[in-house]
């Protein structure tokens, strides 16, 4: 580039053919580089053709997870140990024991026999002192006016 002559304007460079020579030189260089870099594609491209029958679908296998000791359990073997069947009397005894441990009483009947004193009793009003249901109230506004019935 140092030995090349630089034209004063692009018009002089075009007239002398300098632009054409430079373009041809750059074009040759890029063509040589593209030839060198051309190599077979590294990944083969598979084009599917619908006319050919597809292969069989892939096999799907369901694997069983091994148990804690490393042995795969069969479909008929129970994963949990069988619980012994308890009689009604045994279940009621366990229930009473748990209830006594948690609530402090062994049977629910003890609780129902005691009157509940925690709740206040309802005081019934005599029928005469109650207000009749047919009373129509007129609401008053904050300033003592007739409220909603006031006309403007």
Swiss-Prot record:
InterPro entries in alphabetical order: SUZ (IPR024771), SUZ-C (IPR024642), SZRD1 (IPR039228)
Keywords: Acetylation, Phosphoprotein
Keyword Cytoplasm recorded: no
Residues covered by the SUZ-C domain: 111-152
Name of protein: SUZ RNA-binding domain-containing
Biased composition (Basic and acidic residues): 113-130
Disordered, as annotated region: 30-86, 99-152
N-acetylmethionine modified-residue sites: 1
Annotated signal peptide: none
PANTHER family found in the cross-reference section: SUZ DOMAIN-CONTAINING PROTEIN 1
Pfam family, one: SUZ-C
Phosphoprotein listed as a keyword: yes
Recorded family membership: Belongs to the SZRD1 family.
Biased composition, class Polar residues, residue ranges: 66-79
Positions of the SUZ domain: 42-107
PROSITE patterns hit by this protein: SUZ (PS51673), SUZ_C (PS51938)
Modified residues (Phosphoserine): 37, 39, 51, 105, 107
